[in-house]
Amino acid sequence: MTKVVVTGAAGRMGTQIVRLVRATPGLAVSGAVERAGSPAIGKDAGTLAGGEPLGVAVMDDLARALAGADVVIDFTSHEASVRHAQACAAAGVALVIGSTGFTPDAKAKVAEAARKVPVVLSPNMSVGVNVVFELVRQAARVLGDGYDVEIVEIHHKHKRDAPSGTAVRLGEVAAEALGRAPADALAYTRHGILGERPPWQIGIQTLRGGDVVGEHTVFFCGEGERVEITHRATSREQFARGAARAAAWLPGKPPGVYDMADVLGLRGGK
């Protein structure tokens, strides 16, 4: 049985993850962590997730929760995820990170922790989205430079980072498939008199509002036709399901940074 610690266990994603982990054969919730001062401290993680008691009380001490654990699932913030990665490295516990908004410095710190333990770091744990990454890769390769690539994403009004990590990754995938450097190709939310669109550019537009779980569309705009690849999330459950799948896959792997393409066996599509 793989023992799983869930951080942010009382949040919207954390409660979904607790439910999915307890429903996944071979996985068990062994620990639940929240920030210091959270009203969830001391409460049963299973009850907070809307189910039967698990006998696992939420605590604010990750180091203590890691004792005897095999893997941590972390959907908190990129700042907290860096601290959690460092704690996991010190304890020798694998880590699945679904947080977004990572700066280059934060990613470097996660990579440093991954020299000691295996880490899955993915901007989107949804199986469907990771299939979309591969579809975009193939479409960009086949359609080539004759099609302009644009990306539009929309999320709920509470999402703090923009654009979404998924939108950025979609742009990176398209750029790499077209032989372009993402740092040069990606353009975010245009404004003003900019002149004609550069042919090498990949635009990313961000919308926020309501309770939209997440929607991403990649447009390949050619002369006389347009190809659209869209993923719509209607529930956070698919993110939790993907995270549980990653948690079952990761323990025992060599140290290093992995993503959902590794978990799903999609590397052959590169």
From Swiss-Prot:
Its EC number is 1.17.1.8. It comes from the Bacteria. NADP(+) binds at R35. GO terms for cellular component: cytosol. SUPFAM superfamilies: Glyceraldehyde-3-phosphate dehydrogenase-like, C-terminal domain, NAD(P)-binding Rossmann-fold domains. It catalyses: (S)-2,3,4,5-tetrahydrodipicolinate + NAD(+) + H2O = (2S,4S)-4-hydroxy-2,3,4,5-tetrahydrodipicolinate + NADH + H(+); (S)-2,3,4,5-tetrahydrodipicolinate + NADP(+) + H2O = (2S,4S)-4-hydroxy-2,3,4,5-tetrahydrodipicolinate + NADPH + H(+). It is found in: Cytoplasm. (S)-2,3,4,5-tetrahydrodipicolinate binds at H156, G165, T166. Its main location: cytoplasm. Signal peptide: none annotated. GO terms for molecular function: 4-hydroxy-tetrahydrodipicolinate reductase; NAD binding; NADP binding; oxidoreductase activity, acting on CH or CH2 groups, NAD or NADP as acceptor. PROSITE patterns: DAPB (PS01298). Pathway: Amino-acid biosynthesis; L-lysine biosynthesis via DAP pathway; (S)-tetrahydrodipicolinate from L-aspartate: step 4/4. GO terms for biological process: diaminopimelate biosynthetic process; lysine biosynthetic process via diaminopimelate. Keywords: Amino-acid biosynthesis, Cytoplasm, Diaminopimelate biosynthesis, Lysine biosynthesis, NAD, NADP, Oxidoreductase. The active site is at H155, K159. Coiled coil: none annotated. NAD(+) binds at G8, A9, A10, G11, R12, M13, E34, G98, S99, T100, S122, P123, N124, M125. Gene3D superfamilies: Dihydrodipicolinate Reductase, domain 2 (3.30.360.10), NAD(P)-binding Rossmann-like Domain (3.40.50.720). Belongs to the DapB family. Catalyzes the conversion of 4-hydroxy-tetrahydrodipicolinate (HTPA) to tetrahydrodipicolinate. NCBIfam families: dapB. This is 4-hydroxy-tetrahydrodipicolinate reductase. The gene is dapB.
